[in-house]
């Protein structure tokens, strides 16, 4: 965006040393004829926005990360299901629902990242199939459509998410809080006057929706001497 020649060497070195996650996001967005009906002892599960499936204990989590480190899709899957229409019915026609399955997955598969283009629909079948085991009403007759995005797809469509990394970089001690994205730099500001950062690589991280942008706007207001009317 700027050009390395316009930045000091100490800054470009920090950029090059920034660490990205080795895994990204695999997403299956599904349109349904009815809401998901989970088989659960606790009825509040069918009112929840987020439901986590497949991570029954610490061994499942370790298996998940081992498989990703080996360049393999997680199988059996361990993922989060989001239910947006439970909170905002306007996201679907009356009586219909949408869900999103979010599964961590490696960008660089065994055989190369391009392999995602070959297997993503098959892996989406596995993810949806597992959901059907927990919610029998999720079946071909109730699925109106779906849209699948592999880590490779995400990296193609969002330049902030290198290798599909929705967190905007590793959440290690040296890349968190005031150290994000780089130690010793003024938060949300760059060496280029008037150029600010507000993507997932800034504090707090990706997934904290609007927080990065809100913090960035506050920094801009401070620099420009603009009253923060939104903070009143």
Report residues per predicted region:
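Conserved FAD/dinucleotide-binding core of flavoprotein oxidoreductases
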Residues: 31-33, 93-127
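Flavin-binding catalytic cores
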Residues: 35-36, 65-74, 117-156
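Mid-domain catalytic core of redox enzymes
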Residues: 1-92
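Hydrophobic, well-ordered secondary-structure elements that form the walls
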Residues: 30, 101, 127, 131, ...
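Active-site-proximal substrate-binding core of FAD-dependent oxidoreductases
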Residues: 222-232
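A glycine-rich dinucleotide-binding beta-alpha-beta segment and adjacent secondary-structure elements
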Residues: 74-82, 137-203
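A conserved FAD-binding loop/helix module that cradles the flavin
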Residues: 200-221
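Short glycine/proline-enriched loop/turn "hinge" motifs that connect secondary-structure elements
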Residues: 89-96, 185-190
């Amino acid at each position: 965006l700027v050009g390395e020649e316009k930045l000091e060497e100490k800054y470009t070195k920090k950029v090059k040393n920034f660490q990205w996650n080795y895994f990204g996001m695999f997403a299956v967005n599904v349109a349904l004829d009815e809401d998901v009906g989970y088989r659960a002892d606790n009825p509040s599960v069918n009112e929840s926005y987020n439901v986590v499936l497949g991570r029954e204990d610490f061994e499942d989590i370790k298996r998940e990360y081992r498989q990703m480190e080996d360049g393999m899709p997680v199988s059996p899957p361990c993922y989060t299901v989001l239910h947006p229409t439970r909170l905002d019915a306007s996201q679907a026609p009356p009586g219909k629902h949408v869900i999103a399955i979010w599964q961590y997955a490696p960008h660089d598969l065994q055989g190369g990242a391009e392999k995602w283009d070959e297997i993503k629909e098959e892996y989406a079948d596995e993810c949806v199939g597992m959901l059907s085991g927990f919610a029998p009403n999720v079946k071909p007759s109730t699925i109106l459509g779906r849209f699948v995005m592999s880590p490779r797809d995400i990296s193609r469509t969002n330049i902030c998410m290198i290798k599909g990394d929705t967190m905007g970089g590793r959440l290690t001690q040296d890349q968190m809080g005031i150290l994000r994205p780089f130690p010793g730099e003024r938060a949300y500001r760059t060496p280029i006057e008037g150029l600010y950062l507000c993507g997932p690589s800034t504090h707090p991280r990706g997934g904290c929706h609007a927080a990065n942008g809100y913090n960035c706007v506050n920094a801009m207001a401070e620099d420009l001497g603009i009253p923060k009317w939104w903070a009143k």
